[in-house]
């Protein structure tokens, strides 16, 4: 008896898998980290100083941090103490729309996205993580101590998305509803296709106050055709129905296909690099652990 699709090992996403990711995701620096598969965009926001407390002056305190108004009022020196914003709040937006439930080789892009989300959550376990799943129902959940509830949410919302039902709201709609706290960093995990203008507008607004790291997932079939065989394709939209073949054995067609794919990727980079601090590209034909440990996901 054949397995149900959601139970197939290349499709299923289990909580033990996400728990095991911590074994390699929390390493300080992946081996060979110089091969980072990312590009720098606009300059990042420098961590600011947050006022922590006011106390009586002590030897060694910075003179420039003396509060002269309080000192004059009380007749003895008082110092304002500050702490640097090292522990940024981290908001993670994961796209689980139907387009992410595609994969031509070893996995669905949505599953790789969930694994990446889990790795980033484990990496920043001591930060305040907030997870937003863009799917049938946009889900928003903040970390309260353990990261386990966030990992359980990833499994649950991934499972819901396997139905591939059309969404009533766009990724731009979900972005427009994100209210980030001061100094928070936003990580977005989504498809590799060029952004709609509405998404670019939302990114532009958010980037004024927040650092944005943008992860794109690209399937091997979205980069080039296999050299042998034909792949059936069908387009079925209102007022548009088409059936045909992608012929990887035809050298001219295969070359034009690859050129179009590269042009699309380049166009997406040109859109995003002025709007985000870091732009990453993940290969859906490789495991996340392989890309992480080879340094392709290094964020340094």
Sequence positions of predicted segments:
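Amphipathic coiled-coil/heptad-repeat helices and related helical stalk/stem segments
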Residues: 50, 117, 171-172, 198-199, ...
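Residue-level marker of alpha-helix boundaries and capping positions
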Residues: 111, 193, 258-259
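Von Willebrand factor type A / integrin I
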Residues: 1-33, 37, 42-43, 180-182, ...
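An amphipathic, basic-hydrophobic helix/alpha-beta surface used to engage anionic
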Residues: 1-145, 185-189, 222
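A short, compositionally biased
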Residues: 130-132, 151-152, 226-229
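Von Willebrand factor
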Residues: 146-184, 197, 219
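Short, flexible loop segments at the rims of nucleotide/cofactor-binding pockets, characterized by
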Residues: 69, 161-167, 190-192
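DG-centered beta-turn motif at the end of beta-strands
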Residues: 68, 95-96, 182-202, 212-217
């Amino acid at each position: 008896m054949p397995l149900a699709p959601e139970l197939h090992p290349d499709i299923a996403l289990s909580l033990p898998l996400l728990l095991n990711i911590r074994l390699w995701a929390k390493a300080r620096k992946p081996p060979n980290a110089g091969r980072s598969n990312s590009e720098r965009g606009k300059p990042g926001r420098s961590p600011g100083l947050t006022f922590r407390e006011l106390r009586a002056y002590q030897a060694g305190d910075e003179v420039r941090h003396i509060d002269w108004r309080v000192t004059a009022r009380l007749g003895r020196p008082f110092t304002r103490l500050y702490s640097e914003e090292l522990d940024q709040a981290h908001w993670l937006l994961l796209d689980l729309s139907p387009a992410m439930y595609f994969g031509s080789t070893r996995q669905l892009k949505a599953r790789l996205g969930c694994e990446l989300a889990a790795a980033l959550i484990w990496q920043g376990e001591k930060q305040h993580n907030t997870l937003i799943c863009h799917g049938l129902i946009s889900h928003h959940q903040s970390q309260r101590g353990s990261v386990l509830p966030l990992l359980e949410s990833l499994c649950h919302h991934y499972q819901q998305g396997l139905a591939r039902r059309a969404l009533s709201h766009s990724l731009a709609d979900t972005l427009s509803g994100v209210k980030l706290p001061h100094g928070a960093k936003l990580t977005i995990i989504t498809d590799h296709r060029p952004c709609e203008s509405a998404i670019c507008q939302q990114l532009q607004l958010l980037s004024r106050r927040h650092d944005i790291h943008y992860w794109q997932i690209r399937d091997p079939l979205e980069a080039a055709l296999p050299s042998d065989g034909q792949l059936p394709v069908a387009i079925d939209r209102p007022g548009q129905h088409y059936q045909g073949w992608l012929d990887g054995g035809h050298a001219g067609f295969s070359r034009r296909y690859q050129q179009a794919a590269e042009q699309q990727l380049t166009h997406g980079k040109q859109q995003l690099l002025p709007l985000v601090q870091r732009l990453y590209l993940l290969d859906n034909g490789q495991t996340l652990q392989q890309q992480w440990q080879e340094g392709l996901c290094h964020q340094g």
